[in-house]
Amino acid sequence: MAQNDIGIDLGTTTIIIAQEGQGVVLNQPSVVAVDTRKNSVLEVGDKALAMVGRTPNYISAIFPLKDGVISDHTMTRELICRFVNQVYSSHMVKPRVAVCVPAAITGIESDAVVEAVVAAGARQVYLIDEPIAAALGSGIDITIPDGRMIIDIGGGTTDIAVLSLGGKVKATSVRVAGNHYDEEILKHVRNKFSIAIGQRTAEELKKKVACCPQKTDFNEMMEIKGRSLLTGLPVRVNVSTSDLYEPVMMLSEQIGTAAHQVLEKTPPELAGDIYRNGVVLTGGGAQLHGLTEYLSQELKVEVTVSPDPVNCVALGTAMSLGLGDKLETGFTDATPRIGRR
């Protein structure tokens, strides 16, 4: 693998870039701040995120990725170009780039990813399915005949796959993930407490307070501030773990059902491997309190969290460039699609 080759986890909420041997070299929010009067980009990443909810009307914060795929091609190209240029100098040889994508991505959606990465200066582009990247980045050897199951819960999608001999045996992708927890918590707080809160407050509640009820020893409380829907004035309320059970379980059950369906379709020998090896959770959503307990109960197997759930997809994506000949499915040289070599 060349020194400047990179792997990109093109996430709905965060873009992470890694290089094998160096680890994560960039971790930035997937957001662009745009001056709509001039149609010009002001900031990207952390600086753009700091503007969300605190800007004049003519400054718009754009999240150009939705549910794991590109929804705004121009802004995604801008993000990737700026971030890639941060990690390698313009005088260096153009990098080979591997990008992870949802397992159920369509041809049109994957073409959009490739076009954006080539516009950023890549000389060759490879696409790798997220569950495969997550397994590699978690230190799992998927090239041997031993069934492993990955549940990767990102910002926009949850990818579930059974892997063996370098490829996918069974897989599915559901559009239930971290952002959806934020949205449901925001709506639930609005309905239960008659208070309007922002997306960042909802995310903080998810990380610090939310929990599946199967984890009986967890009970936290957090004071939040927002705007009263009754008076229109600033107000503060305390939200407890039990207050959030309803939205948390509604979404967790959808992930559990999807995982159950994948297991039901898994060949018996591989199902036995999974019973022995357990299931590994990856992605930022894997850190939800009580989720391992709930999924263990639902799937009747041990469920554990990857040693580095947030970064493992990017790390595995970077690793894939040196393992391409050992990956049977889910790893594709996508450069020819757009006539580039």
What are these regions (language model features)?
Residues 1-153, 161-279, 286-341:
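Nucleotide/phosphate-binding catalytic cleft detector across ATP-hydrolyzing
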